[in-house]
Amino acid sequence: MSTPRIVLGVSGGVDSSVAAWKLAQQGEPIAGLFMQNWADDGSGDCRAEDDRRDAVAVCGVLGIPFHFRDFSGEYWNGVFAHFLAEYAAGRTPNPDVLCNREVKFKHFLDAAQALGAERIATGHYAQVAHRGGRWRLLRGADRGKDQSYFLHQLGQAQLAATLFPIGDLEKSTLRRIAQDAGLPTHAKKDSTGICFIGERDFREFLGRYLPARAGEIRDPQGQRIAEHPGVFYFTLGQREGLNIGGVRGRAAAPWYVVGKDVANNVLYVDQDRDSPLLQSRWLQSEQAHWVTGAPPARRFTCTAQTRYRQPDEPCTVDVQDDGSVQVRFERPQRAVTPGQSLVLYDGEECLGGAVIAATDAPLERQLAGSSFSSEVVA
C-alpha cells in the first residue's frame, strides 16, 4: 500500500464522499479515515455503525484505502466534559466548534501525519486561501451550507495542512456529482443536531449526565406561572418544550425564555418573542482566537454572527488587554447567549471568534450580577 499524500476524513455522508471523489480524480495517492468520536452507550443508536459501513463502501467504489481510528476518549476529555460543565453552569455551548479544534484538526491531523500524509481534507463547506503571507479561512460558496462558523478556531498550522475539496460547490451540484459518480451515499440525508445525541431526545440524553432539579418558571414580574424540569435544558429565546398551559389572565400566546437564574433554579419567560429583556447591543467575550494569529487592529469594524446561519450583523470590536473582545452592534440583537460562539467576518473572510461570556440584555445582566429582584426587572 502506497503512502497517501492526503488523508480525507470520511464520515459516511454525501459531502465527504464527493470530497473523496474530487481528490481521487486528481490522481494523487489518498486514503480515507473514519473517526469514531462517541463510544456506544447502550442506547441503541447505531448511526455510527451505519456511517462507518457507508464510508467503507465509498472508499471501495473509489478504490482508496480505508482506515479507522477511535477518538472517543479524546472526544470525551476534550469536548464532552466541557459540554457538560457549560450546561451545568447554565450556559449553552457549541460542541461542534470544540470538536473541530480538539479532534478533527488535532488528533485526526496527527493520525494522518502518522500515516505519512502531508495534508488532510474534510467535507466541510469552507475554503482556504493564502494571501498577504497568511492562510485565510473563507466562507463556502454555498452560503446556506457555509461551515466557517464552526471552523473559526483553526490556526495557521492547521489551515496550511488542510484541503476543503467541496468548498467551491453548491449542495445541489454536489448531489448531482454524487449520483453521476455512482456514490452509494448520493441520496443519504444530511445529519443535523449535536453529533453524539443523534436522533435521541435532548432532555433525556442530558438528564443521564446532569441530575434534573425542578424549579419555578416566572414571568418578568416575578409571578410563578409553571414549573420546569431543570434550567439547563433551556436556552435564551427558546419556545419549544416549556409546557406552559393556559395561564389565568394571560393571552393564549407562546412563551419564550428570557432569563435563567441558575443559582436559584428559576426560569424567566415572556410572551413577547422580541421582548426587550432579550435584546442586547453589547457583549463581552472570553479570550478570542484569530485565524491569522492576530486581530486586524485593537479596534475595528466588521460583521459578526452570534449563532450559526444568522445574518451578518455590523459591529465594532475592541480587543482587550487580556485577549478578550468587547463588541458593540449597530442594532439590538435578540437572544445573544453566553456559551455560544461569536464569529467575526470581513466580507468572505472569517477573522476568528470567541465564546460569548456576557451581554447587556437587561435580565441576564441582573442575574449575572446579583440575585433577582422583581422590582428591578419588571
From Swiss-Prot:
Keyword entries, A-Z: ATP-binding, Cytoplasm, Disulfide bond, Nucleotide-binding, RNA-binding, Transferase, tRNA processing, tRNA-binding
Biological processes annotated in GO: tRNA wobble position uridine thiolation
Catalytic activity: S-sulfanyl-L-cysteinyl-[protein] + uridine(34) in tRNA + AH2 + ATP = 2-thiouridine(34) in tRNA + L-cysteinyl-[protein] + A + AMP + diphosphate + H(+)
Coiled-coil regions listed in the entry: none
Start and end residues of each stretch annotated as Interaction with tRNA: 145-147, 307-308
Cited InterPro entries: MnmA-like, MnmA-like_C, MnmA-like_central, MnmA-like_central_sf, Rossmann-like_a/b/a_fold
EC nos: 2.8.1.13
One Pfam match: tRNA_Me_trans_C
GO CC aspect terms: cytoplasm
Positions annotated to bind ATP: G9, V10, S11, G12, G13, V14, D15, S16, M35, G123
Region spans: Interaction with target base in tRNA: 94-96
Site (Interaction with tRNA): H124, Q340
Compartment(s) of residence: Cytoplasm
Disulfide pattern: C99-C195
GO molecular function: ATP binding; tRNA binding; tRNA-uridine 2-sulfurtransferase activity
Residues the record marks as active site: C99 (nucleophile), C195 (cysteine persulfide intermediate)
Top-level taxonomic group: Bacteria
Family: Belongs to the MnmA/TRMU family.
Known function: Catalyzes the 2-thiolation of uridine at the wobble position (U34) of tRNA, leading to the formation of s(2)U34.
Name of protein: tRNA-specific 2-thiouridylase MnmA
